[in-house]
Amino acid sequence: MLTAITGINWGDEGKGRMVDLLSQDYDIVARYQGGDNAGHTVKNERGKFVLNLIPSGILRPDVVCVMGGGMVIDPEHLEKEIAALTEKGVEISPKNLKISDRATITMPFHVAQDGLEEERLSKTGAQFGSTKRGIAYSYGDKFMKKTLRMGDLVHMDASVRKRLETIVESKNLTMVNIYGQQPVSVDEMWAWCERYAKLFAPYVCDVGQFLAEADDAGKKIMFEAQLGALRDIDFGIYPYTSSSNTVSAYAPIGAGIPGRKLTLSIGIMKAYSSCVGEGPFTTELAMTEADKDVLREHGHEYGAATGRPRRVGPFDAVASRYGVQCQGCDELALTLLDVLDYMEEVPVVTAYKLTDGTTTNRFPTGKTLDDAQPVVEMLPGWHCDISGVRKFEDLPAAARNYVTRLEELVGCKIKYISVGPERDACIVRD
């Protein structure tokens, strides 16, 4: 069984929380794209964990976690993440964490270039809101064949050294001539690679073969996405996207088994909207700044990976319907419904008004999206604490009506409803 857990919106939907819950029924959890720009927060009986690179299934002792070839991996960050988890009593070894030999390495110069370019762009207000983790530059060099992969750490021989020399020579053309930096040292980069080769070579393997054999043996495999549909490099709000494919169709590819088909696609959808970074975010126009500040505080809307305040707004049915379509969802998990407990009335963006005066419920692109205005429907609030509810029929009528209205608007059944950050704070509907 191959199941994809993906984001419907801009990211930060609560994927890590749902992966932690649902992985109890799975044997393997595999990340298939992205890097340490992810911030998957999990809160359970063992404490609070923020996972950037390692799949959220790592908190279950019987689950094997896989970092797929579609990922970009910063070994320096991975070392720190493993140390932080180990300090909290989470056991990590090559037995329960496997790293694809095809995964791209995020080198120190990728991180440096990301920060330098964002600083350059910010001088003219053209910045993208990058996390400055080197993600775009890792993927860019991957496609230009000018970086190393995790498999190279297993065979640190003269041929890898020669490739590194060519890579650094090319990178220095940019770092020195465009950004005015000191040239990158080949010797320093080689020493850096040797350090992480000793540390991570035992974890590196052909995860494609591992996953294929597991699938053939009837093992249950879950694919965990990073970010949401609206940040997909092809189907997101370009150029304000990530640099990888976040959609479910890419899950088997990025994980390492491109010829396999998904059995189930579960989309994670937030009960309101949030966004980190630049670009059009129509729903935020539907609330006053004061109301957004209150929502941000109630939802603790600050980036798990960056700490940056997130932009917030009402649930956006136009964007969410598009996200559901992109992810090919069979069912949905609605998260953070409890955050809306304080509202007397709950706004929902049901359509966009365009500059020609017409309205649409289809998600537009380009200039049309830039100029769109939200059309808002107000729904009754429930104005009580629902965090202790575990059955749908025990929710207040207004909360049940909110859930069913969202189902109507996005065209997909909501099976799971999260009413708190704890592992068991979830309603499962038949």
Task: Indicate where each model-derived feature is located.
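Non-transmembrane, aqueous-exposed alpha-helical and coiled segments at domain scale
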Residues: 1-430
